[in-house]
């Protein structure tokens, strides 16, 4: 019988993959997930992403598909577009990009030609690979000029960016980051872009949920084009979007994504995006975003109380970035020690980091995922205390370190067992 396998459960068909999924579920539930680019999606988002839209190929856009049978695909994609525009107050949107990197590349393809000058934040100061970093296509195909932060404060130096813009005459300026925890002055970025005749791209991948909830400055009034992932603080499936208020730019982006960058869109992911956008439009999401920031601030306060240095001295978002140099500990050593005990974060470069990228002098923490789980300030203060205990133990004797490890394992288990 040809369809013999189609009705069987995963555990029967592929026990190895089933066991991997079961193991990952246990890992997520039993540990503290503090990677700033991660979150826990709702059951409804999971159901949409695991739906039969997986089966549907729908090259093109609603009303202009290259395949028949796209009636419901058109409806769900239009829902995603309408909800996204309502969420951010923009006029046009493309919900098809598979990732944030592809969204940024789609903007480059729409607005730039090879060799054009692009100004973006340097990787070690908090920028993203796609903001002109040398290993990325953005650094290979374009003349990438990187701005840094102030050495003393760790804050973006807008005067430096203006000087670079006047000197290099860019075609595109990128505002956004992957590890900059402070607010961004999108208005000043636009003023600089206008001064030199450049487009302004706001990459809000990390801040999107906070912006949607009104807890972080919005670039919609200022940016020519906005890109974002749909996971992270927006708490949707892994994917991306592109938004703009300019119809001419929107038309170019439509062509650059399809047929320029991608073929058939992932309709099951677009369905999940639509669900996530609907969730973000609810009043409860504003409360969630407020709690994200309260929790990250509580975490940062504990770090400072325990003598750790924070990049920029604090946070305005879901991110806290630690500078470990005063402890003579590397990010690599710290992150491995924490992971072993169920505290999951990532090693991270700090501004002007003397260490190599796979070693680093910093750690990055995010509060979005555990806030989704229900943790509040008191729990994040406890997390901060545990992190500090582990970092301090790395330079202690073996007996002290082992005692700390046993204590942290117990405390992590007690904390997570209350929020499964």
Curated annotation (Swiss-Prot):
Pfam families according to UniProt: SHMT
In-chain residues carrying the UniProt-annotated modification N6-(pyridoxal phosphate)lysine: 232
GO biological process: glycine biosynthetic process from serine; tetrahydrofolate interconversion
Keyword Cytoplasm: yes
Binding site for (6S)-5,6,7,8-tetrahydrofolate: 123, 127-129
Reaction(s) the record says it catalyses: (6R)-5,10-methylene-5,6,7,8-tetrahydrofolate + glycine + H2O = (6S)-5,6,7,8-tetrahydrofolate + L-serine
Keywords from the named record: Amino-acid biosynthesis, Cytoplasm, One-carbon metabolism, Pyridoxal phosphate, Transferase
Cofactors, names only: pyridoxal 5'-phosphate
UniProt-listed PROSITE patterns: SHMT (PS00096)
Pathway annotation: One-carbon metabolism; tetrahydrofolate interconversion; Amino-acid biosynthesis; glycine biosynthesis; glycine from L-serine: step 1/1
Site positions (Plays an important role in substrate specificity): 231
Top EC class for this record: transferase
EC number(s) from the headed UniProt entry: 2.1.2.1
InterPro entries: PyrdxlP-dep_Trfase (IPR015424), PyrdxlP-dep_Trfase_major (IPR015421), PyrdxlP-dep_Trfase_small (IPR015422), Ser_HO-MeTrfase (IPR001085), Ser_HO-MeTrfase-like (IPR049943), Ser_HO-MeTrfase_PLP_BS (IPR019798), SHMT-like_dom (IPR039429)
CDD domains membership: SHMT
GO molecular function, one term: pyridoxal phosphate binding
Compartment(s) where it occurs, according to its Swiss-Prot or TrEMBL record: Cytoplasm
GO cellular component, one term: cytosol
Subunit structure: Homodimer.
Sequence similarity: Belongs to the SHMT family.
Function: Catalyzes the reversible interconversion of serine and glycine with tetrahydrofolate (THF) serving as the one-carbon carrier. This reaction serves as the major source of one-carbon groups required for the biosynthesis of purines, thymidylate, methionine, and other important biomolecules. Also exhibits THF-independent aldolase activity toward beta-hydroxyamino acids, producing glycine and aldehydes, via a retro-aldol mechanism.
Protein name stated in the entry: Serine hydroxymethyltransferase
Phylogenetic classification of the source organism: Bacteria, Pseudomonadati, Pseudomonadota, Alphaproteobacteria, Rickettsiales
């Amino acid at each position: 019988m040809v369809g013999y396998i189609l009705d069987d459960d995963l555990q029967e068909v592929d026990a190895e993959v089933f066991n991997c999924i079961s193991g990952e579920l246990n890992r997520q539930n039993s540990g503290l997930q503090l990677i700033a680019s991660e979150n826990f999606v709702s059951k409804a988002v999971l159901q949409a992403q695991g739906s039969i839209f997986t089966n549907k190929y729908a090259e093109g856009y609603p009303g202009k598909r290259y395949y028949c049978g796209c009636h419901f695909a058109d409806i769900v994609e239009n829902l995603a577009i309408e909800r996204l525009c309502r969420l951010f107050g923009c006029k046009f949107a493309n919900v098809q990009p598979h990732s944030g990197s592809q969204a940024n590349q789609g903007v480059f393809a729409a607005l730039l030609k090879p060799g054009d000058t692009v100004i973006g934040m340097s990787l070690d100061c908090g920028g993203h690979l796609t903001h002109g970093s040398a290993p990325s296509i953005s650094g290979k195909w374009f003349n990438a000029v990187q701005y840094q932060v102030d050495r003393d404060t760790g804050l973006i130096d807008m005067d430096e960016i203006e000087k670079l813009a006047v000197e290099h005459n860019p075609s595109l300026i990128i505002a956004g980051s992957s590890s900059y925890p402070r607010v961004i002055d999108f208005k000043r970025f636009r003023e600089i872009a206008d001064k030199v005749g450049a487009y302004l791209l706001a990459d809000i991948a990390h801040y999107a949920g906070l912006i949607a909830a009104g807890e972080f400055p919005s670039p919609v009034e200022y940016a020519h084009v906005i890109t974002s992932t749909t996971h992270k603080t927006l708490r949707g499936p892994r994917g991306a979007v592109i938004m703009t208020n300019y119809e001419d730019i929107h038309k170019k982006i439509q062509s650059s994504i399809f047929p320029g960058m991608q073929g058939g869109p992932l309709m099951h992911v677009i369905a999940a995006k639509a669900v996530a956008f609907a969730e973000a439009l609810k009043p409860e999401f504003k409360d969630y975003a407020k709690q994200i920031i309260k929790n990250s601030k509580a975490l940062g306060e504990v770090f400072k109380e325990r003598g750790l240095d924070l990049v920029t001295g604090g946070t305005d978002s879901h991110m806290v970035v630690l500078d470990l140099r005063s402890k003579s500990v590397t990010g690599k050593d710290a992150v491995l020690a924490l992971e072993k005990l169920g505290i999951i974060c990532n090693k991270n470069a700090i501004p002007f980091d003397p260490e190599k990228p796979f070693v680093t002098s910093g750690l990055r923490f995010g509060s979005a995922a555990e806030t989704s789980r229900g943790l509040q300030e008191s729990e994040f203060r406890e997390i901060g205390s545990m992190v500090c205990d582990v970092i301090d133990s790395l330079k202690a004797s073996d007996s002290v370190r082992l005692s700390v490890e046993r204590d942290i394992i117990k405390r992590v288990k007690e904390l997570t067992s209350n929020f499964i």
